């Protein structure tokens, strides 16, 4: 029951979600749109996002901006900074118990498919899933190709989604392919939330295509917090994810 209760804080009654990742500072440092953490959180929460995805430090200092207004997905893994010569391994940086103390509604863990460190990340994910489920906390697994050139290839994304599901995640965060995504969704028995990736010219059309293909929502960072008005952008995306789907 605990897992289902917490998932309801992330996904609406329609089973859809708009998550705003604000975790880029953990590896990129202060970037455009996130120089002021308080303002960044406030803007996306005012837009009506279902949840935010952040690192432990931001969760601890900015809780008054989101508590009771948006769900908290806490990232517990980290790999490197933008200066690292080897950014292909993500290790545990926060325990599940600490995530609980910070009020997490869900745990987020990274798995890079095709990395030289797949085995180590598999082991970490297995332990995190076990620890989280023992405490009634759901896991959102961000499973993406290690090599960005494969980010939108159906074969790679199919493996990413299915592997995350098979390892026990309650939801998957990965990319939406331009073709074959419906079959990827069918082969994954847990919700798939679409990662935003780099900024694109028309994120709204990307979301419409993903939702039509069976996505359970989005987790858009740069396409939201670097928008001219993040609050307005969240409202637009929320309408597409929730209202547009409800009208079908």
Regions found by a protein language model. Give the residues of each.
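Alpha/beta enzyme core
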Residues: 12, 17-194, 200-220, 231-244
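A short, acidic, flexible beta-alpha connecting loop/helix-capping segment that sits on the rim
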Residues: 222-228
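Flexible, glycine/charged-enriched surface loops at secondary-structure junctions
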Residues: 246-248
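N-terminal basic/disordered segments at the start of proteins
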Residues: 1-12
């Amino acid at each position: 029951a605990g897992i289902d209760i917490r998932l309801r804080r992330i996904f609406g009654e329609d089973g859809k979600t708009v998550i705003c990742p604000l975790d880029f500072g953990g590896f990129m440092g202060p970037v455009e749109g996130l120089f002021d953490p308080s303002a960044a959180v406030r803007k996306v929460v005012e837009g009506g996002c279902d949840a935010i995805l952040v690192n432990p430090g931001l969760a601890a200092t900015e809780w008054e901006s989101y508590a009771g207004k948006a769900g908290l997905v806490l990232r517990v893994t980290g790999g490197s900074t933008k200066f690292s010569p080897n950014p292909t391994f993500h290790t545990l940086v926060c325990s599940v118990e600490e995530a609980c103390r910070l009020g997490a509604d869900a745990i987020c863990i990274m798995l890079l498919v095709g990395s030289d460190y797949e085995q180590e990340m598999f082991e970490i994910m297995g332990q995190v899933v076990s620890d989280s489920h023992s405490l009634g906390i759901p896991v959102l697994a961000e499973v993406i190709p290690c090599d960005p050139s494969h980010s939108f290839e159906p074969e790679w994304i199919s493996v990413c989604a299915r592997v995350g599901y098979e390892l026990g995640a309650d939801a998957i965060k990965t990319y939406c392919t331009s073709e074959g995504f419906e079959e990827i969704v069918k082969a994954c028995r847990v919700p798939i939330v679409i990662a935003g990736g780099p900024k694109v010219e028309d994120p709204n059309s990307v979301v419409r295509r993903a939702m039509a293909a069976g996505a359970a929502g989005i987790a858009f960072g740069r396409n939201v917090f670097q928008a001219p008005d993040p609050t307005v952008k969240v409202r637009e995306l929320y309408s597409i994810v929730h209202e547009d789907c409800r009208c079908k």
